[in-house]
């Protein structure tokens, strides 16, 4: 492990020199690529430096315990020894986690599909709450968020299903833990007796696929057009700008109606289809390796109830790791950082256990 860490640090220093080279700076593609690699290594190098300092401090305090005759100095050395005896193993564990192989899709952009489940109008409203939550989370992360498809409910302002595209740094790696069934417990606006109702919405997070990831044959596609119910200026309900594409071999159907032209909607729909097919391919690879299937957090099993939002008690519970917070309003306002970090740490710990077990 330590040979690997030293190699990483050497590479980090090498990139640091290259990034100040005028020849590299003038080549924007190379500069961007090196800068991304540099950023990816910085956390490991920082943790490794901290580990080495702690290890040196532990050794020095140990030597002082044996050589120091002054009682006061010896007491200080003992305190340092006790502190670093705990700190060094913790930092070593952190390094092991940081050295875990990165998942192939983690650095990619993502599509998020939200569907209202059981609960009628209340489920549709909750689905809209989740959409707003993810939109605000995207804003907090500096990600770009675009609505690809939106199927309104006929009730109180919620929706049956919606699809958004998120673009930015490490989007899929951050959002993948949101896949699954989200349950809400609250008193609906239409409830006159004050009774708490339970509703649900499902979330699917898909990594965005590149053109070279998936080969799609034209003869496998069936494309239909229809009049859009979304934005589109004067074209709305007059021109068939909305597009629905069916991938015949898999039975997957995607639709897009948010753009102003049929061509734009077709391009967006193809992007959605490619991501869905890539997600299937990725899941098959993960199943073969049995890496992510070993951990319920990582699989994002869309049939599993993962989280409950209890409005009367302002409580959110993630059932996969037993995480509970009473900051429900903040969470719905896009402050998902604490809960996602807890899920990420749990996932890393489980992967490390699996690696050691193997």
From Swiss-Prot:
SMART domains: PCRF. Methylated by PrmC. Methylation increases the termination efficiency of RF1. One of its GO terms (molecular function) is translation release factor activity, codon specific. One of its GO terms (cellular component) is cytoplasm. This is Peptide chain release factor 1. Gene3D superfamilies: 3.30.160.20, 3.30.70.1660, 6.10.140.1950. Keywords: Cytoplasm, Methylation, Protein biosynthesis. InterPro entries: PCRF, Pep_chain_release_fac_I, Pep_chain_release_fac_I_sf, Prokaryotic/Mito_RF, RF-1. The modification N5-methylglutamine is found at residue 234. PANTHER family: LD18447P. The gene is prfA. Peptide chain release factor 1 directs the termination of translation in response to the peptide chain termination codons UAG and UAA. Belongs to the prokaryotic/mitochondrial release factor family. SUPFAM superfamilies: Release factor (SSF75620). It comes from Chloroherpeton thalassium (strain ATCC 35110 / GB-78). The keyword Protein biosynthesis applies. It is found in: Cytoplasm. It holds the Pfam family PCRF. The keyword Lyase does not apply.
């Amino acid at each position: 492990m330590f040979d690997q860490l030293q190699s990483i640090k050497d590479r980090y220093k090498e990139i640091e020199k290259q990034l100040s080279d005028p020849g590299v700076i003038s080549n924007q593609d190379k500069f961007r690529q090196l800068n991304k690699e540099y950023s990816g290594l910085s956390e490991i190098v920082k943790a490794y430096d901290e580990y080495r300092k702690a290890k040196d401090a532990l050794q020095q305090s140990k030597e002082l315990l044996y050589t120091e005759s002054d009682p006061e100095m010896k007491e200080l050395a003992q305190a340092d020894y006790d502190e670093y005896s705990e700190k060094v193993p913790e930092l070593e564990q952190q390094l092991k986690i940081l050295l875990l192989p990165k998942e192939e899709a983690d650095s990619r952009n993502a599509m998020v599909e939200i569907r209202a489940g059981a609960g009628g109008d209340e489920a549709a409203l909750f689905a809209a709450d989740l959409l707003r939550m993810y939109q605000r989370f995207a804003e907090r992360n500096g990600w770009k968020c675009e609505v690809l498809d939106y199927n309104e409910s006929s009730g109180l302002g919620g929706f049956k299903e919606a699809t958004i595209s998120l673009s930015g740094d490490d989007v899929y790696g951050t959002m993948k833990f949101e896949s699954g069934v989200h349950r809400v417990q609250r008193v609906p606006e239409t409830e006159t007796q004050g009774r708490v109702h339970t509703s649900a919405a499902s979330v699917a997070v898909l990594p965005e696929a590149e053109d070279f990831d998936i080969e799609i044959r034209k003869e496998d596609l069936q494309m239909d057009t229809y009049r859009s119910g979304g934005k589109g200026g004067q074209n709305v309900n007059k021109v068939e700008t909305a597009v629905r594409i069916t991938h015949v071999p898999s039975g997957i159907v995607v639709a897009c109606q948010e753009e102003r032209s049929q061509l734009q909607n077709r391009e967006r729909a193809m992007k959605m289809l490619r991501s869905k097919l890539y997600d299937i391919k990725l899941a098959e690879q993960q199943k073969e390796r049995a890496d992510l299937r070993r951990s319920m957090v990582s699989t994002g099993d869309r049939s599993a109830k993962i989280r409950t939002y209890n409005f009367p008690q302002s409580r959110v519970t993630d059932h996969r790791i037993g995480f509970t917070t009473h900051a429900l309003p903040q969470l719905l306002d896009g402050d998902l950082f604490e809960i996602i970090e807890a899920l990420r740490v749990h996932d890393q710990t489980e992967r490390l256990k699996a690696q050691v077990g193997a």
